[in-house]
């Protein structure tokens, strides 16, 4: 997809990493109801056991107050990563108003990710994930998720955002969020905002999954780049991690987004930006019939939810003046799926973004225009 590639050395190995990796959820006001709405240059490092993190105790009721206590960096001042922390970039990242992102994961000692259901991974207790945001190059926030032991029926993940000090000396947890953080247009989410999106997947993590870790060029020839002619995002860690024993049920091949050209781009975009809510068994299942998440068993565009559910789907709410269907082939201006992406009042997604994604809205518009009546 979109995004320049740069080479970054991580734990002694060169990985192709995206220089700009959008991933977030949108800020339109909720009126009626929002419910309807680079391949690696060298083998990535194996995720070894995480070292003990001193002050961190899985029995504490709350998480660390400072980012420096979360275990991301062995030396915070120099930003030296803790041994075992691995960078990754999703192949199909979520739009976040053009913010630049870095993502990291750390697995606990000797643990494996349960991949018996390849569409719904379960992470071991002790897993940690971080995502750092820069806006116009300015370090603004880092989000942290930490899976801890919890009673049955309760959320085992600590989820919080940390606002960076202006001098970059540390970042402080902000449970209630921070609007227009550090003088930017970027809003740091509250813990409630974190739950809004992350409760909708089986085990909280959205961007670390089968499709997101597959090589973004899986199934493409060298001549089969996306419509923009630029390399896709992603570090393509899936098969390397599988070979190194990080999964209970290792896949034997990358998972290929069906289709070619614009069709492939749109399906990938829906998966990364819409599918974690609009899917079977999601929190919107009873409110909306949209199914925009890819399944690892999808082999052709025609069997995907993006083709079988939104076309001529009667939506729960009519969008003014008379837009009532999910997708009307050939007519993006009559299609809620497109119009809500560009709306100022009923924007999809409803959290985490204030700016229309020109790439995403453009390819969705082109896709609808090309659909046969």
Where are these regions (language model features)?
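Sequence context surrounding c-type heme c attachment/ligation sites in exported
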Residues: 45-51, 120, 138-373
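N-terminal secretory signal peptides that target proteins for export/translocation
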Residues: 1-7
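Short glycine-rich loop/turn motifs that provide flexible caps or phosphate-binding loops at active sites
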Residues: 23, 125, 329
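Ser/Thr-rich, Pro/Gly/Ala-heavy low-complexity intrinsically disordered linkers and tails
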Residues: 1, 15-17, 22-57, 222, ...
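Conserved small-residue
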Residues: 47-117, 123-174
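Sec-dependent signal peptide hydrophobic core
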Residues: 9-15, 360
């Amino acid at each position: 997809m979109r995004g320049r590639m740069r080479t970054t050395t991580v734990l002694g190995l060169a990985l192709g990493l995206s220089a700009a990796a959008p991933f977030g959820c949108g800020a339109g006001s909720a009126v009626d109801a929002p419910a309807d709405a680079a391949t690696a240059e060298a083998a990535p490092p194996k995720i070894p056991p995480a070292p003990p993190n001193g002050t961190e105790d899985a029995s504490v009721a709350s998480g660390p107050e400072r980012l420096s206590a979360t275990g991301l960096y062995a030396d915070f001042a120099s930003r030296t990563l803790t041994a075992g922390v691995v960078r990754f970039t999703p192949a199909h990242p979520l739009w976040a108003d053009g913010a630049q992102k870095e993502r990291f994961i750390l697995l606990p000692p000797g643990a494996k990710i349960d991949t018996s259901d390849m569409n719904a991974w379960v992470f071991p207790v002790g897993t940690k994930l971080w995502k750092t945001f820069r806006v116009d190059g300015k370090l603004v926030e880092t989000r942290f998720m930490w899976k801890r032991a919890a009673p049955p029926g309760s959320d085992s993940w600590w989820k919080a955002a940390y606002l960076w000090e202006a001098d970059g000396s540390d970042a402080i947890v902000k449970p209630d969020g921070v609007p227009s953080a550090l003088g930017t247009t970027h809003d740091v989410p509250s813990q409630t905002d974190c739950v809004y999106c992350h409760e909708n997947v089986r085990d909280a993590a959205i961007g670390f999954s089968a499709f997101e870790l597959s090589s973004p060029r899986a199934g493409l020839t060298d001549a089969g780049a996306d419509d923009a002619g630029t390399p896709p995002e992603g570090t393509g860690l899936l098969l390397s991690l599988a070979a190194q024993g990080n999964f209970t049920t290792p896949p034997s091949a990358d998972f290929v987004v069906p289709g070619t050209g614009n069709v492939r781009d749109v399906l990938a975009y829906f998966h990364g930006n819409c599918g974690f809510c609009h899917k079977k068994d999601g929190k919107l299942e009873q409110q909306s019939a949209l199914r925009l998440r890819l399944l690892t068993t999808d082999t052709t565009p025609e069997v995907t939810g993006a083709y079988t559910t939104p076309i001529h789907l009667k939506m729960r709410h009519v969008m003014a003046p008379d837009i009532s269907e999910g997708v009307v082939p050939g007519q993006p201006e009559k299609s809620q799926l497109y119009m809500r992406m560009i709306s100022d009042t009923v924007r999809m997604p409803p959290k985490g973004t204030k700016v229309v994604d020109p790439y995403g809205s453009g390819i969705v518009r082109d896709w609808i225009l090309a659909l046969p009546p």
